Structure formats: structure tokens, C-alpha cells
Amino acid sequence: MKELNKKEKEYLLNSIRAIKDFPKPGIVFRDITTLLNDKEAFNFLMDHLTARYENFGIDFIAGIESRGFIFGAALAARLRLPFVPIRKPKKLPYITISQKYSLEYGVDEVQIHIDAFGEKEDARVLLIDDLIATGGTAKASVELIDQTKAKCVEACFLIDLKELGGSGTLKKLTKIYSVLEI
């Protein structure tokens, strides 16, 4: 699988706006809307992900709410695969299963339709989101996929905030690919 070189990574990184002190002092928020507004950068990213995953043997792509929907649905369309949304509670209309996870000050959860991966036994799922920080949501999403008897074969992120340790935690459950590491 082709990896991006330093120049290609810099190109993508430069297409993402960094906003200091948002949502609170000391945080640098990575605003992907500028990448989405740049058709060349967005298509470059999607071409890269398509090349990486076109022969990966994936049955489904699952995206984490909400920015994982953008990249996941776009990649699923390119690969002609079904897309499965992993959502916050009470957003899905049919019967769901849930996985709780801890936040700094509380608990949250993610949900998926009970039949999200259809009748396929051991469905191979690619999980995708824009960013991994502490990894709580991604870990819960992998555990949620496991509850359905499907298998998360890899978790893909546009950005890995390495210093927050999420990828280190998540790699105990599945393989990880991050386009950019910050």
C-alpha cells in the first residue's frame, strides 16, 4: 500500500486550518472544513484512501458521527461499498445496540442499528473518522462493531494527535492507519 511522502503530507496538513484556543485556551482545533472546501486537496485525500483500501477485502465502511460520515460516505461511494453510520444516542430510528465510554467528566455512548451489517457473518469493517485524540469514541465504536459479530479490520483517521495517546490505546483492538500524525 502506497504511503504518502513528506511533501504530500505537508500539502494535506496545509489544507487544514489550525485554530488556537478553540474550544478553550490551550487547544489547537484542526478545522477540516478548509480541506473540504479545497477540491484538489479533498480529491487527493480520497484518491489516496481509495488506493489504500480498494483491495483490502472490506465489506462495509463505518463512520463515526459526524465528520467520519463525510470521509466514510465518500470512500464508500468510491469503493462501491455500503456505509454504516455510528451515531450518538437517540439518532437512529430502528432497534439499536449501544456501547458506553468514559469522558473526562462523565459517560457518553455510541449506537448502531442492530442489523447494520446485514446477514453477513464476520463482515470486514473499516472504521473511519477525521481525528483520533484520546481514542474513547473510536474504542467504543470498535467494541460496538464487535458486538454485531462483525470485525473491524482497520481504523482510519485523517489526523492522529499522537500526544493524547488514543492510537496507542486503540491499536490493542485493531490495526490503525492515520494519514497525518501531529
From Swiss-Prot:
GO CC term (a single one): cytoplasm
Keywords attached to this entry: Cytoplasm, Glycosyltransferase, Purine salvage, Transferase
Catalytic reactions on record: AMP + diphosphate = 5-phospho-alpha-D-ribose 1-diphosphate + adenine
Annotated EC: 2.4.2.7
Superkingdom of origin: Bacteria
GO molecular function term, any single one: adenine phosphoribosyltransferase activity
UniProt-listed SUPFAM superfamilies: PRTase-like (SSF53271)
Pfam families: Pribosyltran
HAMAP family: Aden_phosphoribosyltr
PANTHER family, per the entry: ADENINE PHOSPHORIBOSYLTRANSFERASE, PHOSPHORIBOSYLTRANSFERASE DOMAIN-CONTAINING PROTEIN
Quaternary context: Homodimer.
Function as written in the Swiss-Prot or TrEMBL entry: Catalyzes a salvage reaction resulting in the formation of AMP, that is energically less costly than de novo synthesis.
UniProt protein name: Adenine phosphoribosyltransferase
Organism from which the protein derives: Campylobacter curvus (strain 525.92)
